[in-house]
């Protein structure tokens, strides 16, 4: 059937709840090469082809209702001049375009999926027989293009990042491809990214039936299991999922692989066919256990029957059945054309519905991608319903489009927060105009406390010890005296502990400081300084509540009740040493205290 039709294409991808985004999509529309464009040996070099005028020199410049991306590229094919005589055959024949759609779901890294996105279409159209009118030759060329892309990945394996264990990259990807040329649709796929076709059997009935064009390449299929086991591979069930086993030497093995080498069998991949996955190469058979050869099929499009073509990754088909997906797209199109609602595109709607079902089941959403192609007979007022998220194509007008030039990643509402791009300022606080306080080594005290201590140290000590009858200055002098004592301890490099005190204790400390003589102050300094032969064991410092620590500044606090003297200080020092010996009696000596682990303490309140 040589009917005219137009395509409304929408594409959308979402990272879901996964840490990495490994789904990629590709849309390429370009003029189909014809036999007249190829240089003929009979043509003389003195008769070059007429130059193609630039788009700026074209008359008019008006765009059609097929979207800005298509209209800008349609201008590349000039219209024949009204005053000039038409060419014999080239101007009378309108060139058509070929459309290429692909969804690739990567695993083990994004490298294989990205490589397939950039080179798969180029390998397919270079194969001999792809431009043939015979479907069998076209399908053979598509299969050769898949294999050529797979072998090209082998050459790039050294450039791909290695695994965490230092092994070569295990990156691979599924690939579902739809090629539309004229009234023929060619489908090729490897993996579990499916293609669904919506068919309306009765024009009087609004029901559109979903037909699965592809079958997922799962290891549990009898055909795939037989092929895998015939190549020396195996399939193993892990957590309810059948996976292709990766037979690799043990990581501790060095040198060539022999019969005595221990081989680990790891259930690895949940698909039986994919591009990449170079770890599955079998040296005995010379083939890949995870096959890169696709399944191909040919379909003749009828705009009156075929309404939708949906390409999706497993993140979409695991949540939305094919029939539900077709019905959702049909409802979305009815809202757009009948009710005039310009909402989200069909692809975005399907992806959002799938993510919602992932959340309803309380599961971490997988990478989800979808390409929806709406087929309709050629309509004159197609431009009235143009949506910025959709691309409208008429392949007979020879349009050109490449999604790599306009690829924009959309953040997912349920994905891990992405890493900031390099264009943003990596050091916002450093480059900001706000004042940032300098780093000060406060020695376990706040900055304000050190300023107060330094200010008091510069003052005269006599102003601190003079008693006052007024209660408010008395409290201020007491606080300064306590701060001065702490500052003195800091100069002696001794750790101290602050305890809450009331006004009575503060007054007693003020009196003690006033009554102290130079000899008594020297005795207090001797008490604060630990003796040279005193060794603090690790058990004492880390024992926690098992033993009570000695209060070092207790003498100055109790000096009001009993005058301090040098003999009393020596007696107390001897008693402290005796108490420490009794507490450490029976404990095991430690060779190196730094290697000793901390004790676990339990506080019972």
Swiss-Prot record:
Cofactor binding note from Swiss-Prot or TrEMBL: Binds 2 magnesium or manganese ions per subunit.
Compositional bias (Basic residues): 579-588
Protein residues bound to Mn(2+) 2: 105, 314, 366
Entry EC number(s): 3.1.3.16
Cofactor field: Mg(2+); Mn(2+)
GO terms for cellular component: cytosol; nucleolus; nucleoplasm; nucleus
Induction of its expression: By p53/TP53.
Annotated GO biological process: cellular response to starvation; DNA damage response, signal transduction by p53 class mediator; DNA methylation-dependent constitutive heterochromatin formation; G2/M transition of mitotic cell cycle; negative regulation of cell population proliferation; negative regulation of gene expression, epigenetic; peptidyl-threonine dephosphorylation; protein dephosphorylation
Keywords: Autism spectrum disorder, Cell cycle, Cytoplasm, Disease variant, Hydrolase, Intellectual disability, Magnesium, Manganese, Metal-binding, Nucleus, Phosphoprotein, Protein phosphatase
Transmembrane portions of the chain: none
Domain PPM-type phosphatase, first and last residues per copy: 8-375
Pfam family, one: PP2C
Subcellular location: Nucleus; Cytoplasm, Cytosol
Residues bearing the modification Phosphoserine: 40, 85
Region (Interaction with CHEK1) residue spans: 1-101
The keyword Cell cycle appears for this protein: yes
Reactions mediated catalytically: O-phospho-L-seryl-[protein] + H2O = L-seryl-[protein] + phosphate; O-phospho-L-threonyl-[protein] + H2O = L-threonyl-[protein] + phosphate
Subunit structure: Interacts with CHEK1 and CHEK2; dephosphorylates them. Interacts with MAPK14.
Function: Involved in the negative regulation of p53 expression. Required for the relief of p53-dependent checkpoint mediated cell cycle arrest. Binds to and dephosphorylates 'Ser-15' of TP53 and 'Ser-345' of CHEK1 which contributes to the functional inactivation of these proteins. Mediates MAPK14 dephosphorylation and inactivation. Is also an important regulator of global heterochromatin silencing and critical in maintaining genome integrity.
Protein name: Protein phosphatase 1D
């Amino acid at each position: 059937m040589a009917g005219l039709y137009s395509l409304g294409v929408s594409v959308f991808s979402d990272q879901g709840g996964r840490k990495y985004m490994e789904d990629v999509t590709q849309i390429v529309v370009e003029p189909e090469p014809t036999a007249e464009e190829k240089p003929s040996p009979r043509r003389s070099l003195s008769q070059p082809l007429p130059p193609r005028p630039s788009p700026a020199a074209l008359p008019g410049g008006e765009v059609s209702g097929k979207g800005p991306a298509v209209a800008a590229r349609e201008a590349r094919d000039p219209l024949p001049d009204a005053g000039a005589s038409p060419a014999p055959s080239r101007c009378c024949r309108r060139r058509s375009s070929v459309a290429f759609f692909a969804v690739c779901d990567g695993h083990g890294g994004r490298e294989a999926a990205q490589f397939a996105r950039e080179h798969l279409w180029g390998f397919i159209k270079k194969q001999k027989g792809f431009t043939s009118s015979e479907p069998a030759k076209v399908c053979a060329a598509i299969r050769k293009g898949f294999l050529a892309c797979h072998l090209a990945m082998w050459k790039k394996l050294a450039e791909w990042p290695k695994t965490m264990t230092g092994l070569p990259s295990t990156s691979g990807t599924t690939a579902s491809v739809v090629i539309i040329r004229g009234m023929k649709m060619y489908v090729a796929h490897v993996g579990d990214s499916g293609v669904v076709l919506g068919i309306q059997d009765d024009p009087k009935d609004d029901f559109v039936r979903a037909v699965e064009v592809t079958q997922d390449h799962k290891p549990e299929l009898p055909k795939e299991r037989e092929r895998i086991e015939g190549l020396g591979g195996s399939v193993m069930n892990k957590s309810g999922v059948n996976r292709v086993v990766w037979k690799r030497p043990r990581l501790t093995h060095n040198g060539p692989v022999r019969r005595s080498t221990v081989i680990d069998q790891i259930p690895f991949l949940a698909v039986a066919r994919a591009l990449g996955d170079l770890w599955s190469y079998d040296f005995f058979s010379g083939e890949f256990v995870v096959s890169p050869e696709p399944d191909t099929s040919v379909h003749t499009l009828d705009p009156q029957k075929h309404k939708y073509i949906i390409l999706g990754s497993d993140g979409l088909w695991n949540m939305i059945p094919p029939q539900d997906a077709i019905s959702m797209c049909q409802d979305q199109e009815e809202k757009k054309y009948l009710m005039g609602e310009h909402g989200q595109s069909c692809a975005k709607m399907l992806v959002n519905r799938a993510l919602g079902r992932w959340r309803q089941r309380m599961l971490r959403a997988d990478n989800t991608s979808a390409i929806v192609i709406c087929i309709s007979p050629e309509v004159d007022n197609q431009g009235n319903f143009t949506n910025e998220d959709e691309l409208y194509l008429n392949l007979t007008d020879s349009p050109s489009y490449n999604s790599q030039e306009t690829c924009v990643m959309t953040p997912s509402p349920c994905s891990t927060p992405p890493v900031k791009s390099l264009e943003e300022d990596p050091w916002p606080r450093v480059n900001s105009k706000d004042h940032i306080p300098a780093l000060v080594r406060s020695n376990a005290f706040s900055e304000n406390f050190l300023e107060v201590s330094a200010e008091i140290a510069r003052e005269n000590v006599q102003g601190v010890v003079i008693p006052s009858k007024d209660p408010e200055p008395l409290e201020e002098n007491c606080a300064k005296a306590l701060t001065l004592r702490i500052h003195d301890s800091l100069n002696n490099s001794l750790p101290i502990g602050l305890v809450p005190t009331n006004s009575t204790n503060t007054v007693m400390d003020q009196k003690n400081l006033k009554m102290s003589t130079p000899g008594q102050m020297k005795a207090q300094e001797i008490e604060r300084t630990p003796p040279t032969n005193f060794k603090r064991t690790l058990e004492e410092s880390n024992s926690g509540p098992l033993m009570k620590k000695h209060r070092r500044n207790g003498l100055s606090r109790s000096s009001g009740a009993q005058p301090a003297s040098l003999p009393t200080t020596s007696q107390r020092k001897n008693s402290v040493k005796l108490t420490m010996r009794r507490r450490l009696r029976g404990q095991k000596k430690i060779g190196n205290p730094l290697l000793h682990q901390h004790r676990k303490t339990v506080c019972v309140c």
